Regions:
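Short hydrophobic/aromatic segments of transmembrane alpha-helices and their interfaces
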Residues: 9-10, 95
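N-terminal secretory signal peptides that target proteins for export/translocation
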Residues: 1-6
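Bacterial N-terminal signal peptides
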Residues: 10-22
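Generic detector of short, well-ordered, non-transmembrane alpha-helical segments enriched
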Residues: 23-24, 104
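Mid-length scaffold segments of soluble, non-membrane domains
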Residues: 83-137
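Primarily secretory-pathway and cell-envelope proteins
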Residues: 26-89, 138-182
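Generic detector of short alpha-helix boundary/capping microenvironments
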Residues: 15-16, 61, 96
Length: 182
């Protein structure tokens, strides 16, 4: 009789424990399905050591990378590259390799999934963000914003933007905001 009582008590305790833990598991699952900002350590497993652009291979700088891992498993990320083997005209514009698995918008411009060259160019009107296709042809240019208050700038990083679902791609203190296309 005592064995049956202990067994029932154990089963009751186990059931209560599982019921108490269920809301925590549901909350954790919901948190796991949010977009995540990626830092260099997060990208180490998926970032290639070198990338193809305009007929050549360029070494990536994993320490200067960042991106977003979307809740549905897709990625958008960028990394600085060693562009020393390219012509001066390409070096001026091609500073980072940008990969997106989903359609996004940058400064009002639509960008389809793919791999691109990107960079910040400075001219009389200020800093501009340029996007090039894999053949180094200009796709679009948009104004970059200078953020003098940005603490601890690095050569390249991604942060959350002003609104949910918006992200900032920083080159030093200059940034452009991007979001997943709707």
């Amino acid at each position: 009789m005592k064995v049956v009582s202990r067994l029932r008590a154990s089963l009751l305790l186990l059931t209560l424990s599982l019921l108490a833990a269920a809301p925590l598991a549901i909350a954790q699952t919901a948190a796991d399905h949010a977009d995540t900002i990626l830092h260099p350590a997060d990208l180490a497993k998926i970032l290639p050591g070198s990338v193809f652009f305009r007929g050549q291979s360029a070494t990536t700088q994993g320490r200067n990378s960042g991106g977003v891992h979307y809740a549905d498993g897709f990625f958008t990320f960028a990394t600085l590259v060693d562009n020393s083997g390219y012509s001066t005209g390409i070096q001026e514009k091609y500073q980072a390799y940008f990969i997106t698995e989903v359609p996004i918008t940058i400064g009002g411009h639509a960008l389809a999934p793919g791999a691109y060259g990107t960079g910040i160019i400075k001219n009389a009107s200020g800093a501009q963000f340029v996007v090039l296709d894999i053949g180094a042809h200009d796709l679009f240019t948009t104004d970059a914003v200078s953020d003098a208050k940005f603490r601890r700038p690095t050569p390249l990083q991604v942060t959350e933007g002003e609104a949910p679902g918006k992200y900032r791609l920083y080159f030093g203190r200059n940034y452009v905001e991007f979001e997943r296309a709707k």
